[in-house]
C-alpha cells in the first residue's frame, strides 16, 4: 500500500500508463543544447480527477496551445525527471448532462459497485473505470458521435508562470475546503486514484450544480486531500530544484479516439537536432506518427487530425478530445542521459580530484616531511631499513643494547655493526657539510666585504685622478707665460722632464767650461807622481870604514797643489841635463836633489806610444839586502833619467835635425869643458884624492858611452819595497831629518814606488820585473802595476855605485 512501485499495483492500469513506452515525449533528449537557459518549470507525480479539468475548461474559454519551438524549450528544459501529460477521452464529462438521467444512474451504480470491489481488494480501479467508461461509451454512442470537442492548450500563456504555480492556483480553493472538513475516514490506499467514481458521484448528486458545488463535494474526498498534500510537497521540491537549476524532460501523451480508450492514439513527435543555418529548415523538424498501444505498427487512422507536415518556427499542437483531459506527471530519467550525465560528473569529479592531488603534492613538497619518531624500546628487527636515514648513533646504540645486547649470531652482529658504521658515516658527512657551509658563508661574507672595499678604492682612485687632472690643468694655465714654455712639448709630465733635462745640461756645460780654464788638465790621466831619488853617503874618509855605508832614501815629491792644480805642465823635452842630476858628491856633506818648482819630470803620455795594462790593485813585495837594494834603486833612477833625455833628444832630432846637431855639438863641448875642469881640479887635488877621481871619470865615461835601445812601457803597476831593520846603519843627521822629501826606514817599514815597465827588456811584464833588481837567488818579488819608467842597463862585473 501507498507505493507506486509495489508488487500489489502491478496490474494497476495507471502504473502501466506511467511506464507506457508509447507516451509522447514532446521534448526530445537530443535537443538539450537549445534549452539550457530557462530550466525552472517542473511537473512531477501529479494525478488529478479529470472532472476538475473538464469543469474548469467548460467554464473558462481559455485556449491552451503547446508550442514546440523556443517558447516550450525555454519553458520546459531537459531534466532526468520526465513529465507526462495524459489526455484521454472521458464519457463522464459535464457536457453529458444533457443525456438521460437513467443512463447516468446506471453508470453510477456500476461505478459504485466497482469501486467497492476495488477498495476491498486493495487494487487500483482504473480498469473498472475503463470498463465503466466503455459501457458509458456504448450507451452514449449517439450522443458522443455528435460531440467532437477540440481543446487547444496554449502554453504561451504559461511562460510567465510555472506549471506548478498554475496547478496551485487551480487547486487552492480545493485545499482550503479540505482543511475545513472534519472527515476522519482517510483511505490508506494512497496510490489508488478513482477519477471516474468521483465524476459519477458528482453527476449523481447534482448534474446542474456549478463548479463551486462540485469543488465542495470534492473537498471531502480523503484521497483527493492526500493527493493535494502530495502536490504541495512536490511543489516545494520543484522550487528547490528550480533553485538548483535541475533540467527536466516532459512527455505529453495525447489520445484522440473517442470510442475506445484501449485503442487511444498517441502523438509521437520525432525531432531532429537543429544545427542553425546548416539544415534546410530554420527550425527543428518534427514528424508525428499515429499508433495505438496494442499495435504499434498498425496503420494510422484516416480521421486523425495529427497527420501534419513539419511545423513552422512557432507551431501549436491542437489536441482534440471528446470528453475530458487527464494530466499526470512522471519523473522517469532517460538511460542515455543518465550515462552522459554520469560520465560528465565522473570526469568533473576526476578532474577535481586530480587538481586536489596536485595541490596536495605541491603543499607536501613545500612542507617539511613529518616522519614518525624512532622508538628505541620497540623491536623492529635486525635490519632497520629506511630508518637508518633518520636515527642517530645514540638511538641505534640504545636500540642495540635493548634487543641485541647478548647477540651471538655472526650475521646479526655484522649487520648491526654495518648499520652503525653507516649511521656514523652519515653523521660525519652531515657535520662536514655543516662546517663547509659555515666556512663557505664566512668566505662569501669576506669576499663581499673585500669587493665593497675594492669598489670604494676604485671610486677613491677615480676621484683622486680627477683632482690631479684639475691641478695639472691649473698648473699649465699658470705656467703659460713662463720662460720655459718653448721647451715644453706634450703632456705636463713630458714638459717637466724636458725642463729638468735642460737645466742639468746647462749646469754641466757651465761647470766644464770653468774647470778647463781654472784648473790643470782634468781629463789627463797622467797625474803628478812621486819621484824618488836616492841619497848615497860616500864619506868614507871621515868614517874610515868602507863597509859601513848608510842607506838613505831621498824622496823628491810633488805637493798636492803641484800635482793636480797646476795650470801648465812641462813635457820631458824641456828638461835639461842639470835637472837630471840625482846625486851630488861632496866630501863629508850630504846634498839632496831639489825638485824644481815646476813638476818638469812628470811624464806626458803623449810621448809614450806603446802601453800595456796589467791586473789592477795587485800587490808587489820586494825584499832587498843592504847593498843590493841601494845599487838597484840607484841604477834604476839613473836609467830612468837617461832614458828620458835620450827619448827627448830623438824627438827633437826628428823635428829639427839642424838644431839637434848643434845641441849635440854643444853637449860634446860641455863634456869636454867639464872634463877639462875636472882634469884641472884633479891636477889641483892630486895629492888628496887621485884614485877616487879616476874612478869617477871612468864611471862618467862609461855612462855617457852606453847606448840605450828604444823601449815600450807598461802602465799601472805598484812595487812595495820592504827593508830589514838591520839595513839602517848609523845615525841620520838632523838636517836630513828636517827635509820633508827624505824618508827613512825603520823596523817593519815599507815604501812604495810606482814605475813604468820596459816591455822590451821585460816582455812578460811584472813576471820578469825581478830581473831589474835582483842579482842573487835569495831575492823575491811579485809585481802588480808600474807607472814610472824603468830601464835596465847591461850588467858589468866592475859596476859600482856612482856618486854623481
Swiss-Prot record:
Annotated spans, Basic motif: 421-436
GO MF assignments: DNA-binding transcription factor activity, RNA polymerase II-specific; RNA polymerase II cis-regulatory region sequence-specific DNA binding
Q: List the biased-composition ranges (Low complexity).
A: 90-145, 292-334, 672-685
Give the compositionally biased regions (Basic and acidic residues): 335-356
The segment annotated Leucine-zipper runs over: 443-450
- Record's GO cellular component, any one? nucleus
Spell out the Polar residues composition-biased ranges.
275-291
Where in the cell is the protein located? Nucleus
UniProt entry keywords in alphabetical sequence: DNA-binding, Nucleus, Transcription, Transcription regulation
A Pfam family that the UniProt record links to this protein? bZIP_1
GO BP annotations, alphabetical order: endoplasmic reticulum unfolded protein response; regulation of transcription by RNA polymerase II
Q: Using the UniProt annotation, give all residue ranges assigned to the region (Disordered).
A: 86-148, 275-371, 670-693
What region holds the bZIP domain? Answer: 415-478
| Function, in words | Probable transcriptional regulator.
Q: Which family does it belong to?
A: Belongs to the bZIP family.
Q: What is this protein identified as?
A: Probable basic-leucine zipper transcription factor C
Amino acid at each position: 500500500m501507498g507505493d507506486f512501485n509495489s508488487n500489489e499495483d502491478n496490474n494497476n492500469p495507471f502504473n502501466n500508463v506511467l511506464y507506457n513506452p508509447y507516451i509522447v515525449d514532446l521534448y526530445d533528449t537530443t535537443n538539450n543544447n537549445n534549452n539550457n537557459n530557462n530550466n525552472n518549470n517542473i511537473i512531477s507525480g501529479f494525478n488529478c480527477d479529470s472532472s476538475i479539468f473538464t469543469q474548469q475548461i467548460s467554464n473558462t474559454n481559455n485556449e491552451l496551445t503547446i508550442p514546440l519551438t523556443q517558447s516550450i524549450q525555454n519553458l520546459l528544459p531537459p531534466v532526468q525527471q520526465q513529465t507526462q501529460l495524459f489526455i484521454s477521452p472521458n464519457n463522464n464529462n459535464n457536457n453529458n448532462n444533457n443525456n438521460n438521467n437513467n443512463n447516468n444512474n446506471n453508470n453510477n451504480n456500476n461505478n459504485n459497485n466497482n469501486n467497492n470491489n476495488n477498495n476491498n481488494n486493495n487494487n487500483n480501479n482504473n480498469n473498472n473505470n475503463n470498463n465503466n467508461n466503455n459501457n458509458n461509451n456504448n450507451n452514449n454512442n449517439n450522443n458522443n458521435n455528435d460531440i467532437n470537442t477540440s481543446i487547444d492548450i496554449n502554453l504561451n500563456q504559461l511562460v510567465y508562470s510555472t506549471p506548478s504555480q498554475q496547478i496551485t492556483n487551480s487547486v487552492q480553493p480545493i485545499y482550503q475546503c479540505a482543511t475545513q472538513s472534519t472527515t476522519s475516514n482517510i483511505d490508506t490506499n494512497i496510490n489508488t486514484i478513482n477519477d471516474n467514481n468521483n465524476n459519477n458521484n458528482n453527476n449523481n448528486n447534482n448534474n446542474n450544480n456549478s463548479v463551486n458545488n462540485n469543488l465542495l463535494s470534492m473537498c471531502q474526498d480523503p484521497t483527493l486531500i492526500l493527493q493535494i498534500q502530495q502536490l504541495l510537497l512536490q511543489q516545494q521540491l520543484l522550487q528547490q530544484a528550480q533553485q538548483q537549476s535541475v533540467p527536466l524532460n516532459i512527455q505529453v501523451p495525447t489520445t484522440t479516439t473517442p470510442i475506445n480508450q484501449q485503442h487511444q492514439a498517441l502523438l509521437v513527435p520525432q525531432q531532429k537536432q537543429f544545427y542553425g543555418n546548416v539544415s534546410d529548415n530554420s527550425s527543428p523538424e518534427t514528424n508525428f506518427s499515429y499508433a495505438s498501444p496494442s499495435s504499434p505498427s498498425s496503420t494510422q487512422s484516416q480521421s486523425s487530425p495529427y497527420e501534419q507536415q513539419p511545423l513552422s518556427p512557432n507551431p501549436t499542437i491542437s489536441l482534440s478530445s471528446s470528453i475530458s483531459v487527464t494530466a499526470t506527471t512522471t519523473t522517469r530519467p532517460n538511460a542515455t542521459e543518465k550515462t552522459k550525465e554520469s560520465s560528465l560528473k565522473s570526469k568533473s569529479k576526476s578532474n577535481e580530484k586530480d587538481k586536489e592531488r596536485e595541490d596536495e603534492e605541491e603543499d607536501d613538497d613545500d612542507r617539511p616531511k613529518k616522519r614518525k619518531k624512532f622508538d628505541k624500546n620497540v623491536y623492529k628487527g635486525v635490519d632497520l631499513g629506511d630508518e637508518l636515514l633518520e636515527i642517530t648513533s645514540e638511538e641505534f646504540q640504545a636500540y642495540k643494547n635493548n634487543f641485541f645486547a647478548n647477540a651471538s649470531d655472526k650475521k646479526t652482529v655484522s649487520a648491526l655493526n654495518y648499520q652503525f658504521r653507516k649511521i656514523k658515516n652519515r653523521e660525519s658527512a652531515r657535520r662536514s657539510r655543516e662546517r663547509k657551509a659555515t666556512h663557505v658563508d664566512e668566505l662569501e661574507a669576506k669576499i663581499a666585504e673585500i669587493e665593497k672595499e675594492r669598489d670604494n678604492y676604485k671610486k677613491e682612485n677615480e676621484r683622486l685622478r680627477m683632482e690631479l687632472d684639475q691641478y695639472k690643468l691649473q698648473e699649465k694655465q699658470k705656467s703659460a707665460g713662463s720662460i720655459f714654455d718653448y721647451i715644453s712639448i706634450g703632456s705636463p709630465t713630458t714638459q717637466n722632464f724636458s725642463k729638468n733635462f735642460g737645466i742639468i745640461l746647462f749646469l754641466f756645460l757651465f761647470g766644464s767650461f770653468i774647470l778647463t780654464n781654472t784648473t790643470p788638465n782634468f781629463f789627463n790621466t797622467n797625474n803628478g807622481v812621486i819621484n824618488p831619488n836616492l841619497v848615497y853617503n860616500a864619506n868614507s874618509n871621515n868614517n874610515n870604514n868602507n863597509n859601513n855605508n848608510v842607506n838613505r832614501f831621498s824622496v823628491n815629491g810633488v805637493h798636492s797643489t803641484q800635482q793636480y792644480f797646476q795650470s801648465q805642465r812641462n813635457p820631458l823635452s824641456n828638461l835639461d841635463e842639470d835637472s837630471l842630476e840625482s846625486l851630488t858628491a861632496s866630501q863629508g856633506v850630504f846634498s839632496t836633489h831639489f825638485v824644481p818648482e815646476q813638476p818638469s819630470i812628470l811624464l806626458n803620455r803623449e810621448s809614450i806610444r806603446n802601453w800595456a795594462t796589467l791586473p789592477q790593485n795587485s800587490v808587489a813585495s820586494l825584499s832587498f839586502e843592504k847593498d843590493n837594494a841601494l845599487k838597484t834603486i840607484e841604477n834604476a833612477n839613473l836609467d830612468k833619467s837617461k832614458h828620458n833625455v835620450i827619448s827627448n833628444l830623438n824627438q827633437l832630432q826628428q823635428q829639427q835635425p839642424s838644431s839637434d846637431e848643434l845641441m849635440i855639438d854643444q853637449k860634446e863641448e860641455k863634456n869636454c869643458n867639464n872634463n877639462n875642469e875636472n882634469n884641472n881640479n884633479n891636477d889641483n887635488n892630486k895629492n888628496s884624492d887621485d884614485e877616487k877621481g879616476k874612478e869617477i871619470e871612468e864611471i862618467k865615461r862609461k855612462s855617457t858611452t852606453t847606448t840605450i835601445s828604444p823601449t815600450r812601457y807598461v802602465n799601472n803597476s805598484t812595487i812595495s819595497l820592504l827593508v830589514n831593520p838591520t839595513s839602517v846603519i848609523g845615525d841620520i843627521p838632523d838636517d836630513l831629518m828636517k827635509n820633508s822629501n827624505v824618508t827613512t826606514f825603520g823596523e817593519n817599514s815599507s815604501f812604495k814606488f810606482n814605475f813604468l815597465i820596459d816591455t822590451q827588456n821585460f816582455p812578460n811584464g811584472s813576471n820578469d820585473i825581478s830581473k831589474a833588481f835582483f842579482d842573487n837567488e835569495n831575492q823575491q818579488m811579485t809585481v802588480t802595476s808600474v807607472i814610472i819608467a824603468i830601464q835596465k842597463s847591461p850588467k858589468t862585473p866592475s859596476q859600482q855605485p856612482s856618486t854623481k
